[in-house]
Each structure stands twice: as C-alpha cells, then as structure tokens.
Design a protein with these regions (language model features):
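Hydrophobic residues within well-ordered alpha-helices
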Residues: 37, 77-79, 118, 131
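Short loop->beta-strand "edge-of-pocket" segments that line small-molecule binding or catalytic clefts
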Residues: 32-49
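Periplasmic-binding protein-like
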Residues: 14-21, 90, 94-136, 154
Length: 154
C-alpha cells in the first residue's frame, strides 16, 4: 500500500516479533505463550500504531491489547505489572532487555520477516540507486554488522 506513494530502497535489515515477560514470570513460557496470552484474562502491552500492535491483535484476539506511546513506556508498564507481556520487535526487545530493563526477558521470537528500508520520492531514481549502493557497500564491508553489534541489535 505504501509503495503507491513512495519508492523503497533495498532492505537493509530484517526483524521479527518478540514476546517479552518479566524474568520472575514463570507462568508464561515459550511453549505455552500462545495459549496463555490468547484469553480474556491476558493483557498485552504494545507500542501504539506499530507492527507489534497489529501482530498482537491478529494472534491474540481474545486478549486485552493496551497501546503505549513508545517502547520504553511499554517496558516500564510491564515492570509495573500493568500487563502480562510486551509484544515488540525482536531488535527492540534485545536492546532494552540488555540495557535498562534487565528484569524483563524475551521468552519467544516469532519469525515475521519484517523488512526495513528507506522511503524515497518515487521520481528520484538517482537517489534510490545511490542509497541502494550505499546499503550494499556498508553491508559488504561489515559496517552494518559492526553497528548492529555495537548497539546490541540481534
């Protein structure tokens, strides 16, 4: 749908969704998360307007989905027991659980293959070509991998 409005560069990153709970929550596991979270008693925290919100609505239709403004607010809400789990991008979960929210853990990564790319004015083919070349060069020379490692993006 967005491709009607803008052109996109080549993909520079692929991401998936993650199910995050508090470390001391032993009730929800990688084996039973679908059953435990897809019921009327479950509250799932998501970032408003995100792909995680759409994923949660589609995969956990019986749960109460509570949107927050940003990922940090989502994790703060989970730490404050305002929900049973956060659904967010795997890269976001990886970074936040490693840094400021170490009382939270990713219990399940769900493969969704979300591609990240740069939006470009449809008529600007030179810019698109230049961006695609830069993405290729930065990938080939290891810069992308080095940045992902530096910022704990897995």
């Amino acid at each position: 749908e967005r491709e009607k409005e803008v052109a996109f560069s080549d993909s520079y990153y692929m991401d998936d969704q993650a199910i995050v709970t508090k470390v001391d929550n032993t009730d929800i596991t990688a084996d039973n998360y679908s059953e435990k979270l897809n019921n009327a008693d479950a509250t799932i925290i998501v970032q408003s307007g995100s792909t995680a919100e759409a994923f949660a609505q589609e995969n956990f239709p019986k749960a109460k989905i509570v949107p927050y403004k940003d990922a940090t607010e989502c994790f703060s809400a989970l730490q404050s027991d305002k929900g049973d789990a956060v659904v967010t991008n795997r890269s976001v979960a990886s970074q936040l659980t490693a840094e400021q929210f170490n009382t939270c853990q990713t219990i399940k990564q769900v493969s969704t293959g979300e591609e990240y790319a740069i939006a470009i004015n449809q008529g600007n083919t030179k810019l698109k070509d230049d961006i695609n070349q830069a993405i290729k060069d930065l990938t080939d020379d290891g810069t992308v991998d080095a940045l992902m490692a530096k910022y704990n993006i897995k």
